[in-house]
Amino acid sequence: MLGLVAPGALLTRVVTKVPLVVRSGEVTHVGIPWCQAGEPGRGPRAEGENMSAQSLGEQTVDLLGRLVRLGCVNDLTADSGGEERAADLLEDFFSGLPVSIERITPHPGRTSLVVTVEGADPTSAGTPLTLLGHTDVVPVDEAKWTRDPFGAQIEDDVMWGRGTVDMLHLTAAMAVVTREVARRAQDGNSPARSLVFVAAADEEARGGLGVPWIGEHRADALPWDAALSEMGGAHIRGRRGGDSVVVVVGEKGAAQRRLHIRGDAGHGSVPLGRTSAVERLSQVSAALSAARWPTATDEVWASFVRAFEFDETTETSLIHGTYEGDYSEFEDLAAFAHAISHVTVAQTVAHSGGPINVMPSHATLELDIRTLPGVDDDDVDAAIVAALGDLAEHVTIERLLCEDATASSIDTDLYRAIEAALTKRYPGASVVPVLFPGGSDLRVARRLGGIGYGFGAVDSGASLGQVYSQLHAHDEHIALADVRGTVEVLHEVATTYLTHV
């Protein structure tokens, strides 16, 4: 997706006191003074006053509904998404407040919004906090939905709609918290550290027109030192009644490969003594399926296992990589637990052959390989060769997408602020760092030298398995208790981090 960016990407920056427009590297001061809410170009004053009077939870529910109804569907093509509509909505949301706003548009319609509340002394204060949200959502099969996927319908304190879980509720919460910090700054109570909110485009397509594009082409547009994004806050219920709340501290990497498999050409009527590429492909496939791939034995995996409160034998075997079972002990998280503890190899695409009477001499097999922290591309290729044994002499490995896994330390001020807020919210619960099998924009922050955590607060008590099952699902929905809880805990984390330098 990175190759979709067209030359001359449009970048627009708006600063509340002296608006600027930046186009193709040129900076032009616009002859419009700083406007308060209700003045031309800045949205109606009544809306801003009404939003200030609402609770943080009410504001977030309202904004979430509006984002869902936009339907910024990303079908993995450059012209989909239309996230500029969300950028327009959110820019109006901050109207009249002392923030700087930059619009970054690598491709028409694919706008990411960067909103900054400056700290009291940004030149000397601690590292800023960056909130990485995204406004695009995955497509829907409307025939499989029982409600309008873009209607943001509320029933029994639950909102239904595409993106409610992934991740518009958190994006809305980030906007509301940033707005509240800006409102306080307007009243003379600026935070010690700066706060940056990003409403990014194109996350669902790995961000070729979103945060990864910004990191590659405009890394100066936002600080990468300390970031929060999606997928934390769900619960793990232990077998002895314990409660743990997860914080995502890392993500698996991608090491996609195409194997070129050589065979013997010949006429299909005389196969004796020849091995076609199709037959050899089947042998390669079987060898890969039978192989043992690297497993996790680090403390992040160990803390995840301990949260389930298994018997001592099961716990020890899982932690030390000697487990031989099917992960059924994890129940609805069996596939999740296996994925975050292994280098996984999914055989996804195979090609070979032409006329039915010709034995082909070439076949390809594509592998979607997801790696653990510390496993690099050379390790992956070596593991493939080892798995193939003698078959390796007939195979050439082509590297496709290559991204190392990323992980952040938990010995940081930001993690401690998250831990304190979550244990206050859920008395008696433990906070458990976990690796996530998928990807998010946090990988960009980590690769640029920062730390990043997947954050949330699930007041409904939904388990990690229940939350995970909602991702990209038909009839995606979220309990409004979780929306309110997320914004309230995020506000506490931000307040703690921004005021303690």
What are the roles of these predicted feature ranges?
Residues 35-50:
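Short, Lys/Arg-enriched N-terminal segments with co-localized hydrophobic residues
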Residues 52-142, 362-366, 377-381:
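N-terminal helical capping/dimerization or prosegment-like subdomains
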Residues 135-137, 199-207, 230-235, 265, ...:
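Acidic, glycine-rich active-site loops and adjacent beta-strand->loop/helix elements
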Residues 401-402, 428-500:
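Zn-dependent metallopeptidase/amidohydrolase metal-coordination segment
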Residues 125-196, 478:
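Active-site metal-coordination/substrate-binding segment of hydrolases
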Residues 219-220, 226, 233-242, 248-256, ...:
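Acidic-enriched catalytic cores of C-N bond-cleaving enzymes acting on peptides and small amides
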